[in-house]
Amino acid sequence: MAEETQHNKLAAAKKKLKEYWQKNSPRVPAGANRNRKTNGSIPEKATSGGCQPPRDSATGFHREGPTSSATLKDLESPCQERAVVLDSRSVEISQLKNTIKSLKQQKKQVEHQLEEEKKANNKKQKAKRVLEVQIQTLNIQKEELNTDLYHMKRSLRYFEEKSKDLAVRLQHSLQRKGELESVLSNVMATQKKKANQLSSRSKARTEWKLEQSMREEALLKVQLTQFKESFQQVQLERDEYSEHLKGERARWQQRMRKMSQEICTLKKEKQQDMRRVEKLERSLSKLKNQMAEPLPPEPPAVPSEVELQHLRKELERVAGELQAQVKNNQRISLLNQRQEERIREQEERLRKQEERIQEQHKSLQQLAKPQSVFKEPNNENKNALQLEQQVKELQEKLGEEHLEAASQQNQQLTAQLSLMALPGEGHGGEHLDSEGEEAPRPMPSVPEDPESREAMSSFMDHLEEKADLSELVKKKELCFIHHWRERCHQKTHHLLSEPGGRAKDAALGGGHHQAGAQGGDEGEAAGAAADGIAAYSNYNNGHRKFLAAAHNSADEPGPGAPAPQELGAADKHGHLCEVSLTSSAQGEAREDPLLDKPTAQPIVQDHQEHPGLGSNCCVPFLCWAWLPRRRR
């Protein structure tokens, strides 16, 4: 459409231009046309000749000579015509320029209008497309609304049917409700009658329970006071026990320092003995070389044969001593191997004991809960007894293991001290060569071989491991006792807060008492205290028997005193296993004449000055038999 309108406008503009040119085209006179037709190409020359100045014409006239007037007039007339034509043409040219300018302006206006029309057409087309899209979307929405309407109508019909069914059910439920209300009213009436009948009985029971709870509360107050007093006593005994332990540890540390100094001196003496042995070996090698050399032709003298016999005896004696030292070293290596095996067995036992202690710890945590305390008292009492028995068994096993380890270590110490003290048994010097120079007698000593070094290092490592294990057992038992105390405190708290509950005994070393339903008499608290004292006396007697057995084992020739690091692990909160070193040291002094060595004597003197901790029996009073006995 727009192109057609443009073509039409262009055709109309062309027509207007033609009409304008026809109107404004100049009308040429007839004389000029004639001159053009007749002269052809001459008019330009004529115009140019006509434009010449009059001087030229005059000169030409004078040159040509005299002419007639007619010819002059004929010449002037075309010149005038040509001037008029030129003027008319200049005017036409200016008019044409003006028309061109106006046409250009019209053309620009027409182009501007065409562009505006194009933009308007584009906008209309875009709007048309948008409207078409909107019409399509509206049609789709219309279809969707129709489908929704259809579904809504169907759902309305369904809900109407359902509402009718619900109304019918409501009527039935209301009828059922009325029936149930009538039944409920009858039941409530019967219950009220029964409650009135039972209220009289319950009042009597509550009064009797209140009286019983008051009695139990008074008994519990008395028991609380006793428990506080016993707790203060236990704290005082614990402080004394800790101070005593600190003093004993300081003593053992001093002993260990002395032992380390003595070991250093023994090492120095050992080095000196090694040097002597080297000298003796050199002298022996020289003697062997001399014996291997051929005898001189001169007859030997009598004193040389005596010296040779003496040297042979010396060689035999030195060889025997060396063989004995080799046997001793082999025996020490075997003892070290056995000791390592026993240490491994002890580590396995300790690991098993740690697992048992962890299981006991878990069971204690479970038993510490208040619900389990009051819901299952019989099971808890059984578990407590089992735990106490297990703890006692563990302590007995630990005591036996410590005694065995102490005896073994004492044997090893005595053997090593005897081996180190052997260099002091010299019997004077004798002549080694024919010149009569005196030399020290060969003294046997422990050779500085790798087996002896390994034995010493393994021995020290064993002591350190035993100290670590004893500390670990201490920590485990402290945790066990701490949880046991927490459990006892929780029981007392629950018994005080709930006077109608059932009470149980919470004793670490005492007997087992169950709480009954009936109240006890006034002398029950005294009986509980008597039970605690009896348990303590039994415990003390058992401890004395254990110490006596330890002393008897120390009097035997084989076992000895425990190492200082291990004695710290023997005091297991009431089971203080301490063995004196006096009897073993005295027995060794009687049997071994090798203790004349100056480095071995201070060890025995130190053990004699400090006879151990067996005489001071300090046992904490931890038998908490403070709860009342209830007889069935």
From Swiss-Prot:
Signal peptide start and end residues: none
Sections of the chain in a coiled coil: 86-154, 220-421
Region (Disordered): 1-76, 352-377, 423-452, 496-524
Classification via InterPro entries: GM130_C, GOLGA_cons_dom, Golgin_A
Pfam families documented for this protein: GM130_C, GOLGA2L5
Biased composition (Basic and acidic residues): 352-362, 427-440
PANTHER family: GOLGIN SUBFAMILY A MEMBER 8H-RELATED, GOLGIN SUBFAMILY A MEMBER-RELATED
Protein's name in the database: Golgin subfamily A member 8J
Species annotation: Homo sapiens
